[in-house]
Every structure is written in C-alpha cells, then in structure tokens.
C-alpha cells in the first residue's frame, strides 16, 4: 500500500508539472468556446447507447462508473472481471463495429484498464493497454468517418466518443514519454466534442478545468469561461465531480477567494475522503502553493 501511494504521487507530480508547462504555452480559445445547453450526462449516455441490445457478460457504463468510484475510495478490485468484459466487447465490435454503444463501452473499459496499469503497475492490464494503444485511435477515426452518414453515428454519439477517448488519454498524462503529446491532444478533443454537441456538459466543464492550470486573477479570458461552467459541475459523475471540486478549489484560492476555495475542497473531502490527491492538496495549501 505504501508503494502504491508513493508511485501514484510520483505520477501525479510529473503530470502536474507537464500540465503547467503546456498550459502556459497554449493560446486559449476560451472566450469563443460554446456554452453547454441544458443536457444532463444521463441524457447523453442514453443517446450514445440508444438501441444497444444488452450483451451477456459485459459490464455496463453504470458498472464501470461503480468500479471507478470504488477505486477513488481507495478500495481495490479484481481486474479480471473488467478484462473479461473487455474481451467480449472487442469480440462484439468485430461483428458490429457501427454500434456506438459498444464503442462507448470499449473506451470506458479502456480508461479503467489504463488507470490500473499507470497508477498501480498492473502487468496484466499493461498487456491490454498495449493492445488498446494500437487500435483505439483507429476505432475513433473509423467512427468519425461514419458520423452523419446513414446508419452511422450521430453528432451527439461522436461527441461522447471523443470524451471517452479524452478520458482514456487523461490517465496517461503523467507518463513521461507521452506527456506533451497527450497534453496537446486532450483539450483539442474537448473542443471537438463541443463542436459536435454544444450540450456536452462533460466536455464544457473539463475544458474549463483545463484552463484552471494557467488561470489566476489576471487571466480574464480564462476566468469568464471557467466560472460560466461552474453551475454544471453537479451534472458530472462522482469521480469527475471530485476532480472538478479540487480544481475549482485551486482556482478560487489563486484568485484569493479563500472561502470558495475551502468550500470546494470540503466538497471533495465529503465525496472521497481517503483519496491520495487530498493529501497533496492539503500539503500544498499549507505551503501556500495553489496547485495539485
């Protein structure tokens, strides 16, 4: 367990350093980013998975989110159920690639597999992750070519798939050989998702969170966009809300609005009180450092 915490914190340190370097070099498009329309994550998930027949032995999106929450509570789980489910998804995709629901599940599984490999060094998941890296981007390109075509993918479905892929990549930002390429790709995927579906709340909030890294009291263009997305945080999944709470806490601390900063930190504590990131944020705040 001690090695787990040390390894994870080392990854997080590299991840944060890379983000800081990239964020300060990016020319923001925050002012022109579309604002989300009223559309909940539940509605978007339903749109992506419409007409999908249940496949026996495959974990649903809800099941995957439950495993992710369990992980965020620092409770381990046996990855074999996840890997077996992933095998069945890949088999199903070989016979029915034009099923947006299956691709959605593919990328949701991929994110969890990557988390277990990157953060814990699970070798079995590492073998699967190598497989995913070789085919995931091709899957996304094929789906993009089918977008808007008859019997293809809708814009809303493709928007959701861009976000699934971005979430998968996000788990790898702390890996040194991938850092810059992934840090460059993730915000582009957020914007692509918003272009296809301005109502994609997850994309809007995560793009706002991305802008928090370089934001401070002087960055009015970032700040207006960040604060315009704040009301949508509660629409996210539990794991995504936790990350947003921490980042918005940092944002308000950097703006010297400490009451709001502490309030968001307490929300994060209430959600996942044992998460390792909380220790890092507390330590940084004590030193007057407002970052992860």
What are these regions (language model features)?
Residues 1-6:
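N-terminal secretory signal peptides that target proteins for export/translocation
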């Amino acid at each position: 367990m001690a090695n787990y915490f040390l390894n994870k914190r080392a990854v997080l340190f590299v991840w944060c350093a890379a983000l800081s370097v990239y964020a300060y070099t990016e020319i923001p498009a925050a002012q022109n980013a579309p604002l989300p329309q009223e559309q909940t994550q539940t509605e978007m998930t339903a749109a992506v998975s419409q007409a999908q027949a249940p496949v026996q032995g495959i974990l649903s999106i809800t099941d995957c989110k439950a495993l992710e929450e369990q992980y965020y509570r620092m409770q381990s789980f046996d990855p074999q159920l996840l890997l077996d489910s992933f095998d069945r998804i890949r088999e199903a995709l070989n016979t029915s690639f034009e099923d947006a629901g299956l691709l959605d599940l593919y990328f949701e599984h991929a994110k969890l597999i990557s988390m277990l490999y990157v953060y814990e060094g699970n070798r079995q998941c590492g073998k699967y992750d190598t497989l995913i890296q070789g085919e995931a981007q091709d899957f996304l390109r094929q789906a993009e070519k089918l977008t808007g075509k008859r019997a293809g993918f809708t814009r809303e479905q493709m928007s959701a798939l861009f976000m699934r892929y971005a979430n998968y990549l996000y788990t790898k930002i702390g890996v040194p050989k991938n850092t810059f390429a992934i840090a460059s790709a993730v915000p582009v995927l957020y914007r692509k998702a918003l272009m296809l579906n301005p109502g994609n709340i997850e994309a809007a909030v995560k793009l706002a969170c991305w802008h928090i890294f370089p934001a401070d009291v002087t960055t009015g263009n970032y700040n207006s966009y960040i604060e315009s997305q704040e009301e949508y945080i509660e629409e996210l999944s539990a794991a995504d809300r936790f990350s947003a709470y921490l980042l918005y806490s940092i944002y308000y601390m950097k703006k010297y609005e400490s009451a709001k900063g502490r309030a968001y930190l307490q929300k994060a504590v209430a959600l996942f009180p044992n998460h390792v990131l909380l220790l890092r944020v507390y330590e940084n705040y004590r030193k007057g450092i407002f970052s992860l």
